Amino acid sequence: MTIRADVIRGHTDAVILAQLLRRDSYGYEINKTIETCSGGDFVLKEATLYTAFRRLEDGGYITSYWGDEAVGARRKYYKITEKGRELYRQARAEWDASVRILNALLEGEA
């Protein structure tokens, strides 16, 4: 089931940071990983992805560097910073709390 983009929109940065916790990566690879992890139900638009990269880099949450590809075009890699790790931890805690609250509200639990 494909979900509406607005359901995840506020969590785009956390989704990207989660991918970078695993290893440094470049835009296309990050987007393909997100698509694969979601079973094809969620894909970031390229403009959204690169706007998020700029915002995260400007905020000091990620850094970037050019890879040394022997074949093909050079790729810009992104790396999470310690500040980015902290932002991810905060976003994850907020997400977990949101899920708990929404489940309680939707299931009518007190």
Name the predicted role of every residue range:
Residues M1-I8, A91:
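Intrinsically disordered, low-complexity serine/threonine- and proline-rich regulatory segments
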Residues E57-R74, K79:
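Beta-hairpin "wing" of winged helix-turn-helix
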Residues D6-T48:
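N-terminal helix-turn-helix DNA-binding core of bacterial DNA-binding proteins
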Residues Y50-R54:
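Short, hydrophobic-biased segments on the C-terminal half of alpha helices
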Residues R4-D6, Y61, E109-A110:
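Short, contiguous hydrophobic alpha-helices characteristic of membrane insertion segments
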Residues R22, T36, G40, R55-D58, ...:
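Conserved amphipathic alpha-helical interaction elements at protein-protein interfaces in regulatory
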Residues E86-A110:
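Amphipathic alpha-helical dimerization/coiled-coil segments
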Residues I80-G84:
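Accessory beta->alpha helical hairpin/"wing" motif in late/C-terminal subdomains of nucleic-acid enzymes
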